């Protein structure tokens, strides 16, 4: 895992095991990177990790695979959203607040792609399948009030989140079909408060 500052690399791990960085967030002079590190003792595991100014903080034990996909700082607290693999290969959504985990989904297929926090209230954006099949994947947002499906169409996913005032924006795409050579064709969408706009 590497952080580049003005083009200069800073190695967050030593390369002896697999490690990936998925997200970055800056707060003043502090830079946070989120991802995962494969433990040397368990090649099937992955430790959800936050690096603050290059110093690693492990959020999980590494007994299973877990990762941090989005980070946000609010009120001096570090919020990290990601997912952890459960038995059967399904991913559950996890929100860590100052390192303390709380699940925001049940045992379903979940992938986080965005996080926003203000005054302790969070909005998490991602994709979820209730059957663990990619055929029914849909974008969702999660708040302290629960889950809300962004789009009803299957084979649809969100890839980015923005919040402005009371408005929640999700960018993503939907599988429209396949061309004559069976290449997948996607349509880009923007959802504002759940209302779809084709781009």
Feature-to-residue mapping (PLM):
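Residue-level hotspots at or immediately adjacent to binding/recognition sites across diverse folds
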Residues: 1-199
């Amino acid at each position: 895992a590497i952080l580049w500052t003005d083009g200069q690399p800073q190695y967050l791990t030593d390369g002896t095991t697999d490690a990936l960085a998925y997200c970055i967030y800056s707060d003043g002079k502090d830079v946070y990177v989120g991802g995962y590190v494969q433990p040397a003792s368990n090649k099937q595991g992955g430790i959800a990790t936050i690096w603050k100014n290059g110093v690693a903080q492990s959020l999980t034990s590494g007994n299973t695979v877990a990762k941090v996909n989005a980070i946000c700082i609010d009120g001096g607290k570090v919020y990290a959203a990601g997912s952890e693999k459960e038995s059967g290969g399904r991913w559950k959504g996890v929100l860590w607040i100052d390192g303390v985990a709380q699940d925001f989904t049940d045992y379903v297929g979940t992938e986080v792609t965005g996080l926003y926090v203000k005054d302790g209230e969070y909005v998490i954006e991602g994709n979820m399948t209730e059957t663990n099949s990619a055929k029914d994947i849909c974008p969702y947002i999660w708040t302290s009030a629960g889950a809300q499906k962004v789009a009803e169409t299957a084979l649809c996913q969100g890839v980015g989140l923005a919040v402005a005032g009371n408005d929640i924006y999700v960018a993503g795409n939907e599988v429209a079909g396949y061309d004559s050579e069976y290449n997948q064709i996607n349509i880009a969408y923007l959802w504002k408060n759940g209302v779809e706009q084709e781009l």
